[in-house]
Amino acid sequence: MYTKMAGCRYVVLLAALFGCTQAMSSVVITGTRVIYPAEKREVTVKINNEGIKPVLVQSWIDQGDMASTPSNSSAPFVITPPVSRIDPGKGQSMRVMFTGAALPADKESVFWLNVLEIPAKVVGNEDDNILQMAFRSRIKVFFRPANLSGTAAEAIEKLQWKLITKTSGQFALEAHNPTAFHVSQSNLALIAGSSRVASEAGMIGPGATQLFGLPDLKLLPTGAVEVEFSAINDYGALVPIRLPLKL
């Protein structure tokens, strides 16, 4: 993607930092998350160039900082190759290796895999005033220690939900995760009779308690109340869940 811009010479813009999505990128990561079992020496991540031009790809893992770069990230992983050229219609397998740093043994740890795509320079273009766009995709990496109690699939239904009133007077869903696994979810809503009140969704870490606001709920419901959401499993699939809710 190229745009005329006076006074600029091949400026690389990290468009992902400003809300651009993976769908805008030619490079597609196979899968929406990486599960790294602690007993494995390495795991493999496949990326594909679905565009019509060659691209240069740089990959690294961070600890959740969107502003991270390969030079300042302290995540305990090494990626091989860290930089590669991928031709149109081709793919690249990346080896992700844990360096052995001290991490909790009783719960998962979460990191982020970054894949930065830089399009090839236009050949034969005499105009130096070109803004060259680079796209960054990020997916979660879950480092999973051996011998954790339970499974990631079981953790989904073990979430403990409450409907609470915040000090501001607004209602919210409170979710407590008593397990050793992260639970990611979307399409979160409160179900009261025939009414459905949507809420923001997100990830709930091991042992964590998180609030999800219900700005459209004005009165405390009566009768049976449930919480509904789509949990995201290890394969990136959405699992529909409906659980009873404590008032």
PLM feature segments, named:
Residues 25-48, 151-168:
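Beta-sheet-dominated interaction scaffolds and their linkers
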Residues 32-70:
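N-terminal targeting signals for Sec/Tat export/insertion, comprising classic cleavable signal peptides
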Residues 47-51, 173-179:
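Asparagine-centered strand-capping/turn motif at beta-strand->loop junctions
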